[in-house]
Amino acid sequence: MVTEPDAAADLGDNDGFLAEHAAAIHSATSRIAGHVRRTPTLPADEIATGVAVKPEMLQPTGSFKVRGAFNAALSLLGRSPDARGVITVSSGNHGQAVALAARNLGLDCTVVMPEGSNPVKVAAVRALGARVVSEGVTGANREERARELQERTGLAMIHPFDAWDTIHGQGTIGLELLDDLADLGTVVCPVGGGGLLSGCAIAVKAARPDVRVIGVEPELAADAAASMRSGRHERLAAPPATIADGLRSLSIGDRGFEVIVRRRLVDQLVTVTEDEIEQAMLAVWTRLHLVVEPSGAVGVAALMAGRIPPSPAGSRIAVVLSGGNVDPALSARLLAAHAARLATGGSAP
């Protein structure tokens, strides 16, 4: 499904907003330099002609989340040099990123993760020295539990998506795409809580309002598309059962809603099926030789399904591959099915 705003974005109303937040994203680039990797932008004609990918699985914790985590933690220390620790909620990737930032900056760290979270990601958070709180935690109550712990411990909250410091850090990806691709025509980002999409939209639209920004989410977690259709901040009734565990937020954040829906800085939101996500993962693994997780593959899934409109002639489509922390059991299942299909004369994705 493809969803567009009711009316074309009026960027004239957004000039001050864009200038303020684009400046903060530029500051974040300088702040996090030396703490995160400046990932390359790679041609991906093996996926489709005129496509490039941003492989954020090459970051130290395997996802883009280190950008927002380090920007938030460093900004915290700039404001409160005596801060002793941080707390966050996460399904995995953000938790790893905050744990790494906390360890490297000498801060205590607690990560509230729902029961049943990806065991690879839970183990990785613990390996980085963070305390994991999961007992009785669900996707629906995790933020409430984190706020309770924050009040008891005095730790500073680093929100995974609904905080400007986090959004500004994620927006550094947009600046890098602009630097790398003079012929950039379209940016495609996953959307869960909306931090990555919002940050990239601000960075791109502030410099190049002609570049289209498209968000992609699973059909089973299509709250952002519902919000764009209705103009209201829609929320899912229960945690979605999508394979894309990093995109299981019940809703986009308040700040994401402002950027994506109210200010119309995102041109389209599209959705993809679970099978399309799996086929996209296999395509990235086998064609680009990059390990991408389900959440990171949704942009390629939309592209392969024909839901991303062609860019204007001569311009590129840049797809953000947001992470590569895959559950080994899922990898084994997909690769076994792929091998069986090839063995019986089936085609590769």
Predicted regions located by residue number:
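PLP-dependent amino-acid enzyme catalytic core
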Residues: M1-P349
